[in-house]
Swiss-Prot record:
GO terms for cellular component: extracellular region. The keyword Lipoprotein does not apply. It comes from Gemmula speciosa (Splendid gem-turris). The modification 4-hydroxyproline is found at P3, P4. This is Turripeptide gsp9b. Keywords: Disulfide bond, Hydroxylation, Secreted, Toxin.
Length: 36
């Protein structure tokens, strides 16, 4: 639902920028948070 979609839309420079819902942390290739 909402958390994974939110993760993929959130820009990040490191895993610390991503919420606990973003189980894959920061996807550096895309510069966005991601889920597993």
């Amino acid at each position: 639902g909402d958390p994974p979609r939110f993760c993929r839309d959130k820009l990040c420079s490191g895993d610390g920028d991503c919420s606990v819902w973003c189980t894959a942390g920061c996807n550096h290739d895309m510069g966005k948070c991601d889920t597993l």
